[in-house]
């Protein structure tokens, strides 16, 4: 009877338990079905509400922390592939159940909140790639958790008062899937719900997608573009090589590109030309050709002017020698010299003899002796070949001009006298300037007619009549005195190292001449003083004086008249009568200015060519 009563009592308890459970499950399922019928979109929301493996790990971590706090060793076993937990061991031990309930109640709500927040922070800090790698399985929510099944942890809400009275085995509570979620829901129900946790998880996933894959996509696009351009370049190169092999090296490009390249090259060339012209102009301005000349350019111009003048002078010497050698001077010259010597020598004739001796580089006493003797010195004469006059001054070799003494040759003749300089050439002279004018400027207009009878054949005057200079004791026999017919401008511009020696020689020579011929004391002060210009009145007076002398000496020979006319040109009127009056200018100053102007034009042209060459070399 007792057993039957106990059995009945247990059955009654089971019935009561079933009575309380069945209406709750029916009500929950009925409410769920109504919601699903009204709002079909809730199915998708419910799919998202299922817990993810990350959430399960977080809860497991929370449970481990709780167990470590109470120093309890337990190994909860969750089967993620099953929606219903299966108890591994069933132990009915009331004491252990009471311990579990007491351990659950010991933790306060604040401690549970702190544990959950720490778990969420750790889940946020973990990268999504690590989480994906740690997944041991692929969760298929539709298969594992069907929508129609009401066996979810949200739907099965166990009332607390029932849980207190009911006793479940310990292992069942720890290994069940519902209990941890129920505990968390009971603790965090007011602040965090599974929906909020699911939204947070989705937000974290979206943030990970926005940060990571965007940069990867950009890098992929850049790499694809690079590969595409490299492929195009390779194709273009292969086509270009094939086209060059067929055509022969020409560029395989369209006409528009060729036209553009041509225009760019033209613009570039024009810019380069303009820059070169500007540089040339700047250099010319700096050098003083367009602006104020500096000292270096002045020295260069003087040097070039002296070279040009030396070329002209050497050419004129050769011209005079060639003209004089072609004429025969026989008995008439001897008679004229005898008549001159028979007459009493006045100051003008002596001055003329000194000038002739200077022009011919013969001492005056030797010249007088030759005129008196009337014989030809055979031992001092060398035959010379016919002279060939040059056509242009530039053909004169520079080796004979660049010497300090521009009239002294490198090699000497057999008699010890310098040979004639190199062959010269003569350009077209400017208007109003002729060979006779130049000879007049140089004081050699009548040298050909004054040739003595000692040189009837074709002999060079420089080689035949160049005698040893007159000096004390013949100590300086090999030196040649300064040429008298060098222009004053040339003598001023050409600096010579041995100028003092030549001045000393000239002083000794003049002193000996004054001792030997005291009549020259009055005419020694007649010096040639060049001035920048001559007035028309002076020219007219000199022309009248020359005409009067010619009329007075009309009975004499023509050569004597020319000699006296030359002397009258050299000696101004009134200079012998009154020494205090200023010296007159010479008629040959205008000719000299013309010659210098002509040389300056050549100098300017040569300077321009020189500057252009230097500019081209610098570029």
UniProtKB/Swiss-Prot annotation:
Signal sequence residues: 1-30
GO molecular function: chemoattractant activity; cytokine activity
Renumbered residue ranges of the record's region Disordered: 247-307
Cross-referenced InterPro entries: Chromogranin_CS, Granin, ScgII
Keywords in alphabetical order: Calcium, Cleavage on pair of basic residues, Phosphoprotein, Secreted, Signal, Sulfation
Entry-linked Pfam families: Granin
One annotated GO biological process: eosinophil chemotaxis
Compositionally biased tracts (Basic and acidic residues): 255-286, 295-307
Residue numbers bearing the Sulfotyrosine modification: 153
More details: Binds calcium with a low-affinity.
Family in the record: Belongs to the chromogranin/secretogranin protein family.
Protein purpose: Neuroendocrine protein of the granin family that regulates the biogenesis of secretory granules.
Subunit comment: Interacts with Secretogranin III/SCG3.
Official protein name in the record: Secretogranin-2
Organism whose genome encodes this protein: Rattus norvegicus
């Amino acid at each position: 009877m007792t057993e039957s009563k106990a059995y009945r009592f247990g059955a009654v308890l089971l019935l009561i338990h079933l009575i309380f459970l069945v209406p709750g499950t029916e009500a929950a399922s009925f409410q769920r079905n109504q919601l699903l019928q009204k709002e079909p979109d809730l199915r998708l929301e419910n799919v998202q509400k299922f817990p993810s493996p990350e959430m399960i790990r977080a809860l497991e971590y929370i449970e481990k922390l709780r167990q470590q706090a109470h120093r309890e060793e337990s190994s909860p076993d969750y089967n993620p592939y099953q929606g219903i937990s299966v108890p591994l061991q069933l132990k009915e031990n009331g004491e252990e159940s009471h311990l579990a309930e007491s351990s659950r109640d010991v933790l306060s709500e604040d401690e549970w909140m702190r544990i959950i927040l720490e778990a969420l922070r750790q889940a946020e800090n973990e990268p999504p790639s690590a989480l994906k790698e740690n997944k041991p399985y692929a969760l298929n929510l539709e298969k594992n958790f069907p929508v129609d099944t009401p066996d979810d942890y949200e739907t099965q809400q166990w009332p607390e008062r029932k849980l207190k009275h009911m006793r479940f085995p310990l292992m069942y509570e720890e290994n069940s899937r519902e209990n941890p979620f129920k505990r968390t829901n009971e603790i965090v129900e007011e602040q965090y719900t599974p929906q909020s946790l699911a939204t947070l998880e989705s937000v974290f996933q979206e943030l990970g997608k926005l940060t990571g894959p965007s940069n990867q996509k950009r890098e992929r696009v850049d790499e694809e573009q690079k590969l595409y351009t490299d492929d195009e370049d390779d194709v273009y190169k292969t086509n270009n090589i094939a086209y060059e092999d067929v055509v022969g090296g020409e560029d395989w490009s369209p006409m528009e590109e060729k036209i553009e390249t041509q225009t760019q090259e033209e613009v570039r060339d024009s810019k380069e030309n303009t820059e070169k012209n500007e540089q040339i102009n700047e250099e010319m301005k700096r050098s003083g050709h367009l602006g104020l000349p500096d000292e270096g350019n002045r020295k260069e111009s003087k040097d070039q002017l002296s070279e040009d003048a030396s070329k002209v002078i050497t050419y004129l010497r050769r011209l005079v020698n060639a003209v004089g050698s072609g004429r025969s001077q026989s008995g008439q010259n001897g008679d004229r010299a005898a008549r001159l010597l028979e007459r009493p020598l006045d100051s003008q004739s002596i001055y003329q003899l000194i000038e002739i001796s200077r022009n011919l580089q013969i001492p005056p006493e030797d010249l007088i002796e030759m005129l008196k003797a009337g014989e030809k010195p055979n031992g001092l004469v060398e035959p010379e070949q016919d002279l060939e006059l040059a056509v242009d001054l530039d053909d004169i070799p520079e080796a004979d001009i660049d010497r300090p003494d521009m009239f002294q040759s490198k090699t000497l003749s057999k008699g010890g006298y310098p040979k004639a300089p190199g062959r010269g050439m003569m350009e077209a002279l400017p208007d109003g300037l002729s060979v006779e004018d130049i000879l007049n400027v140089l004081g050699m207009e009548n040298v050909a007619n004054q040739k003595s009878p000692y040189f009837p054949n074709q002999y060079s005057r420089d080689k035949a009549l160049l005698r040893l200079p007159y000096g004390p004791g013949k100590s300086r026999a090999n030196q040649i005195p300064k040429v008298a017919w060098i222009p004053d401008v040339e003598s001023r511009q050409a600096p010579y190292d041995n100028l003092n020696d030549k001045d000393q020689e000239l002083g000794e020579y003049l002193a000996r001449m004054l001792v030997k011929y005291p009549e020259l004391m009055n005419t020694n002060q007649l010096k040639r003083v060049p001035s920048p210009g001559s007035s028309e009145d002076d020219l007219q007076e000199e022309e009248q004086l020359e005409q009067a002398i010619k009329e007075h000496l009309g009975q004499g020979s023509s050569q004597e008249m020319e000699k006296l006319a030359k002397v009258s040109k050299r000696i101004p009127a009134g200079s012998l009568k009154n020494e205090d009056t200023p010296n007159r200018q010479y008629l040959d100053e205008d000719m000299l200015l013309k010659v210098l102007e002509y040389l300056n034009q050549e100098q300017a042209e040569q300077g321009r060519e020189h500057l252009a060459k230097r500019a081209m070399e610098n570029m």
